[in-house]
Amino acid sequence: KYTSINWFVESGVAWFALAMFFMYIITFYTKRFKPVYGFVLSVVIAMILGYTGENTDIFCWMRIVNFYPFFYLGYVISIEDITKWLENKKIKVMAIISLITYFVICYVGIDKIFWLRFLLTGRSGYYRLEYGMAYGPLIRLGVYVISFFIVFMFLSIMPKRRFILSKIGQRSLSVYVFHYVFIYVYMASSLYKYLPYKYPNKWWLFIVAIGIVVTFICGTKWPDALCKWIMNSNIKYRKNAKQ
């Protein structure tokens, strides 16, 4: 077997770093606009460019376009403002009900809504909709609305007090980056075939257990320190850009 390298296409961890690089550059030039205009413009552009039929993996440009509204909103809104708005008890109750409803719908109707998954990966255009391409922008907008709503609902029920998982929550970047190593090892071994074959009804329990262990390993001090060292220049850039 031969291994080929494409210098312009990245589907692993590096795409995230590349996307962050371009997002910081874009934000440097858009910070002069009013936040509401910048946010609306980023959403509209993502809705329109979904019609493209070009290679969407080159420089990860499609994922940059689709995920930039989340990045931009996190850039312009302070955590203090979000916390103040989400402290309302009615919102917390609505969040619990909404999240339970969301998970029930996903669990019960996953076969009917799984076709929308490509919109969440950010890599594909509306051509995946086949006969529904005309409604692509509206579907994309709906996905944005639901995604932002779910994010804010999660934030509203997050406890203020720290507990055992709080430290790992602060190190989510290192978990994201280094868990790929364990995925590659898992796929290279025969476990992904052996477990479902040997334990057809309980193999998913092993996956959950492995996932928990991997999360704790990747959330330790050393992986986190390495990620912070790599991202330190980006943090300094962000502070300078806001001045």
Feature map (PLM): residue ranges:
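Alpha-helical transmembrane segments and their immediate juxtamembrane cytosolic regions
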Residues: 1-243
